[in-house]
């Protein structure tokens, strides 16, 4: 293939290279094999250049390495017959390099980016489902996994490495994908993992406290998210006008589509817009009446809570901006399915309603509790914990929110990792006014079981934090555990 040789791959940057055929591209020397291109980047934890001898021993055809402190930009050396090309700022160039290697897959499908603290997974899933109902072959990439709808393979990170992203997109194109919805994390933006992708549209859901252990403060976190619009090929911009940050961004994005549930739309100021006119919540979901610059309509949704209505409206606005007809979108809307582990409802006769959600930030927990309250005739229970070795500042905030919005709070473990579980729980309790009224149970399975067994049939039990996850990280061990499976077993239903 044309760009699978070293000379053609690096033609925009380096001349005089041999036309050496390349089989695969990898950042991991452990999996580098005969004929591969090994890329030696300098990361946060390791310097890939240390593994060049190992890659050569394993038979790689060529190497691209970070030039900093080693060589000049574009310098070519040879080690044991293997060409080594040094490029400066290799991490920043990696997405473009991988894009050339995999034949620019983002240009061969309609690819939509979704960024924001909360709502990324639901919005991407809705986009993929809806577009497929309209005839596309759709795929998702993100927290739940990567793949065509119905064939998603679990992943470790929301946004993989720059090479992984291009590789996965190329694989999806090869499988026939014509539409892709990708979650884009703040880490992925700062680390240039999606820098060379050509997005047909980019969606902003909201911004609230998360990842401050990485970004330091909210200003840097916002700046990371803004990179999607300021330094990337973002295509159509769709922005949540109900979010304070979103309203600020709309002032800098005059062609963006503004989306609102709360009346933050002025048709005279926003050329393209979509807003909820009325929302009625019921035990089956919600009835949404909306108006937009494309027309108006009504949607029956099986999704739970106000924030999921917002996610649905963002997906609708995105597809309208991409040219899908409103009439077709309205005809297919009722067939949209709830998303696994995202306000996912489990019910059985004579048992409490159990809702499993991924909410693991203060804002997400508040919204999940508010959503569950809309569907609760009895007591609202909240079972949650906070992750170990992560942002400690959010723990008391989440404790205060659970105490304020739930009737009964059960604090337990959620991936304690290398921290002492009781220390994490104490951090959560520190945010509560009356911690003595809180039920504390370190074992998560026991806590979930206890809550469901004690709740009455008109109660709602929100199990927050893990969502789709099927593991619990204790120490450095990844143990099998699923809130969904536990809840389903106790109710006698199938997860």
Curated annotation (Swiss-Prot):
A Pfam family it matches: Mur_ligase
Cofactor(s) essential for the protein: Mg(2+)
Positions of short motif Meso-diaminopimelate recognition motif: 414-417
PANTHER family associated with the record: MUR LIGASE FAMILY MEMBER, UDP-N-ACETYLMURAMOYL-L-ALANYL-D-GLUTAMATE--2,6-DIAMINOPIMELATE LIGASE MURE HOMOLOG, CHLOROPLASTIC
Post-translational modification: Carboxylation is probably crucial for Mg(2+) binding and, consequently, for the gamma-phosphate positioning of ATP.
Alphabetical GO biological process terms: cell division; cell wall organization; peptidoglycan biosynthetic process; regulation of cell shape
Classification via Gene3D superfamilies: Mur ligase, C-terminal domain, Mur-like, catalytic domain, MurE/MurF, N-terminal domain
HAMAP family: MurE
Record keywords, A-Z: ATP-binding, Cell cycle, Cell division, Cell shape, Cell wall biogenesis/degradation, Cytoplasm, Ligase, Magnesium, Nucleotide-binding, Peptidoglycan synthesis
Positions of post-translational N6-carboxylysine modification: 225
Record pathway: Cell wall biogenesis; peptidoglycan biosynthesis
Name of encoding gene: murE
Phylogenetic classification of the source organism: Bacteria, Pseudomonadati, Pseudomonadota, Gammaproteobacteria, Enterobacterales
Role this protein plays: Catalyzes the addition of meso-diaminopimelic acid to the nucleotide precursor UDP-N-acetylmuramoyl-L-alanyl-D-glutamate (UMAG) in the biosynthesis of bacterial cell-wall peptidoglycan.
Binding site for UDP-N-acetyl-alpha-D-muramoyl-L-alanyl-D-glutamate: 27, 29, 44-46, 157-159, 185, 191, 193
Entry GO MF terms: ATP binding; magnesium ion binding; UDP-N-acetylmuramoylalanyl-D-glutamate-2,6-diaminopimelate ligase activity
Protein name, UniProt field: UDP-N-acetylmuramoyl-L-alanyl-D-glutamate--2,6-diaminopimelate ligase
InterPro entries registered for this protein in UniProt: Mur-like_cat_sf, Mur_ligase_C, Mur_ligase_C_dom_sf, Mur_ligase_cen, Mur_ligase_N, MurE/MurF_N, UDP-N-AcMur-Glu-dNH2Pim_ligase
Organism the protein comes from: Salmonella typhimurium (strain LT2 / SGSC1412 / ATCC 700720)
Binding residues for ATP: 116-122
Localization per record: Cytoplasm
Signal peptide start and end residues: none
Family according to the record: Belongs to the MurCDEF family. MurE subfamily.
Binding residues for meso-2,6-diaminopimelate: 390, 414-417, 465, 469
